A protein has these predicted regions:
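Solvent-exposed loop and capping/linker segments of extracellular ligand-binding repeat ectodomains
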Residues: 1-350
Length: 350
């Protein structure tokens, strides 16, 4: 239940008094000329919005984590006192008209597991908008993520056309694992700003997203075991790979990352000189139009580091390698039939 409604005459007044408001309050920011009004249910943007792009679209749940409280409302959240209702696996929300909206918020009180997680179901055509952290702690959007918080959350939602935002810079193990796998209507991916990764954080995240044409930037320079494992596997419409700036690799970091990306023609530049176990294992497997690779590795002795990594690429192409590297030819080395160009590696003295 709400305890109070706080009225502020300006956004600056709201910000000055924000920390002193009672919890579970509604705040209305009112400009003097009433041209602007904003309502905040305890925290600004403490919800995500699903908008029907097709009449009769539905949203439900296939699974609900035992740690997950999930609430929804079809009321206008930009007016005081929207009524929030509890969401469970027996609830199906029908958006009768194109443009109808439903708002979700939640709290995840414990770490999920690979058998205890929340998964949405959808029909029709639906766009998501807003900070996905609002599903895990709508009262504190910058709260640390829980393990497996987004595990399979929208997997198989072929009706999802736009993903919610994922602004977290501190991740948790498996946090976005298979989160959007088989979302075949997604064409773009949300930004992923984290620069330090944790194990399996992006594993299979967009696996099977066959309409995805644009990958997010991947600024991370500190990798983790299986962090990008099969991240874009089967993304057959992906035409440009993101840059991979990390220079130190870890086990299975890029394993299967672009497996089956048949529209890729150019691999991301691979600057690390020392490979790690399974780091490029099946990385570019089945990329049938791929015809350009620049890989500057000089130590390729790690276990299965390049096993089948270029199996099924274009029969002709260009491979740029370090001048002092020793590669074999074939599906686990330099593709047969490709032109090889050697390049000096610049040594930076500290």
């Amino acid at each position: 239940m709400l305890k109070s409604i706080n009225i502020y005459e300006s956004i600056s007044d709201y910000e000055a008094g924000y920390d002193n408001r009672p919890k579970k309050s509604i705040s209305v920011i009112r400009e003097k000329n009433n041209k602007k009004r904003m309502v905040d249910a305890h925290v600004k943007s403490g919800f995500i919005t699903f908008t029907a792009e097709e009449a009769g679209s539905t949203i439900g749940l296939a699974k609900l984590s035992t740690y997950q409280l999930l609430e929804y409302t079809t009321d206008n959240v930009f007016k005081p006192s929207p009524v929030w209702q509890k969401m469970d696996v027996n609830t199906v929300i029908t958006l009768e008209n194109a443009g109808d909206m439903v708002y979700f918020r939640g709290v995840l009180s414990g770490d999920n597991t690979t058998s205890n997680y929340t998964q949405f179901t959808m029909t029709g055509k639906i766009a998501a908008k807003g900070n996905c952290n609002a599903l895990w702690n709508y009262m504190k959007l910058n709260a640390p993520l829980k393990v497996y918080c987004g595990y399979y959350m929208f997997s198989g939602c072929t009706s999802l056309t736009t993903a919610p935002e994922l602004p977290a810079t501190t991740l948790a193990s498996g946090c976005y694992e298979y989160m959007f796998s088989s979302c075949t209507s997604l064409t773009t991916a949300p930004e992923l700003p984290a620069t330090t990764l944790v194990s399996s954080c992006y594993q299979g995240m967009f696996n099977g997203c066959t309409s995805l044409t644009t990958a997010p930037e991947l600024p991370a320079t500190t990798l983790a075991v299986q962090c990008y494992w099969c991240m874009f596997k089967g993304c057959t419409s992906l035409v440009q790979a993101p840059e991979l700036p990390a220079t130190t690799l870890v086990s299975s970091c890029y394993q299967g990352m672009f497996n089956g990306c048949t529209s890729l023609t150019t691999a991301p530049e691979l600057p690390p000189t020392t490979l790690a176990n399974y780091c490029y294992y099946y990385m570019l497997y089945g990329c049938s139009n791929l015809n350009y690779i620049k890989c500057l590795a000089t130590d390729i002795s790690a276990t299965d580091c390049t096993t089948n990594w270029v199996n099924g690429v274009s029969p002709t192409g260009t491979f740029i390698k370090a001048i002092d590297s020793n590669w074999s030819t074939g599906s686990s080395g330099i593709p047969s039939g490709w032109e090889v160009i050697e390049e000096d590696i610049e040594v930076v003295e500290e």
